[in-house]
């Protein structure tokens, strides 16, 4: 009998299938995941709780937030950068905006604006920013804000403003801050002659197309003059300085110091 039992092939035991268990686990996970999503959507953590704005100078934080279309208590996950960018297009001085999200509920708008290089003074007392692209921004009246840029007055040729803006944008911040007023003083031979009134009491006479190359030398030139000397500095081909009330000019030597570089 033992011999016959050895010849009979033994039937392998089949393992029970687990498809039913896997399907049950999947349904349970899906169920609880759905519950978690519903709970999150209805919780305060799914809402926008705070909106911050950085990089804005021309527009106020309230203006940017209002124009962006963002509001508190809106869905946190329903904030799209392209939508915000399109909403901010009416604010003409904004070059770009990026949106960052920080959990829970914080939205930050990072604003990049055109640079203010001067102020355009209107006849009615209004004051508008001249941007580095040559555009006079009339959306915002700066009449009640601190004058931290040159004030343009007596300017009869608006077509020259883009050229002036380009030159001013290349000046270092320190030199730009020293300029108080700019007037257009053309001659028969040169329509781009300008006069700059400095905050230290001096006058500078130059031309628009040389301003960005010559004006950054201003701090170095002033160091060559006797202390407390005020007068007229001419920045053309060869700079020279005439004190107020004097007949002769003080020679100016170029190249003794490096000009101040514009901020990138």
From Swiss-Prot:
This is Cell division protein DivIB. InterPro entries: Cell_div_FtsQ/DivIB_C, DivIB, FtsQ_DivIB, POTRA, POTRA_FtsQ_type. It is a single-pass type II membrane protein. Pfam families: FtsQ_DivIB_C (PF03799), POTRA_1 (PF08478). Cell division protein that may be involved in stabilizing or promoting the assembly of the division complex. One of its GO terms (biological process) is FtsZ-dependent cytokinesis. It comes from Brevibacillus brevis (strain 47 / JCM 6285 / NBRC 100599). Coiled coil: none annotated. Keywords: Cell cycle, Cell division, Cell membrane, Membrane, Transmembrane, Transmembrane helix. GO terms for cellular component: cell division site; plasma membrane. The chain crosses the membrane at residues 24-44. Belongs to the FtsQ/DivIB family. DivIB subfamily. It is found in: Cell membrane. Residues 46-114 form the POTRA domain. Residues 45-264 are extracellular. Residues 1-23 are cytoplasmic.
């Amino acid at each position: 009998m033992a011999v016959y039992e050895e010849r009979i092939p033994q039937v392998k035991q089949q393992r029970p299938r687990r498809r039913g268990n896997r399907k049950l686990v999947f349904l349970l996970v899906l169920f609880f995941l759905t519950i978690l999503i519903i709970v999150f959507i209805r919780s305060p953590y799914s809402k926008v709780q705070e909106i911050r704005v950085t990089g804005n100078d021309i527009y106020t934080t309230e203006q940017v937030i209002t124009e962006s279309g963002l509001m508190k208590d809106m869905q946190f996950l329903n904030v799209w950068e392209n939508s915000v960018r399109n909403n901010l297009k009416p604010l003409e001085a904004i070059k770009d905006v990026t949106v960052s999200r920080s959990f829970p509920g914080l939205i930050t708008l990072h604003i990049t604006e055109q640079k203010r290089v001067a102020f355009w003074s209107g006849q009615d007392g209004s004051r508008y920013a001249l941007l580095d692209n040559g555009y006079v921004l009339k959306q915002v009246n700066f009449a009640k804000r601190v004058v931290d840029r040159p004030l343009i007055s007596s300017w009869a040729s608006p077509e020259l403003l883009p050229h002036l803006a380009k030159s001013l944008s290349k000046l270092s911040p320190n030199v730009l801050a020293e300029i108080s007023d700019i007037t257009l003083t053309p001659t028969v031979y040169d329509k781009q002659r300008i006069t700059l009134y400095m905050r230290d009491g001096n006058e500078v006479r130059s031309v628009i197309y040389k301003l960005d190359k010559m004006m950054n030398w201003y701090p170095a030139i002033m160091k060559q003059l006797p202390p407390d000397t005020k007068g007229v500095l001419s920045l053309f081909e060869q700079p020279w300085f005439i004190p107020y009330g004097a007949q002769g000019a003080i020679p100016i030597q170029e190249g003794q110091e490096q000009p101040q570089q514009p901020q990138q």
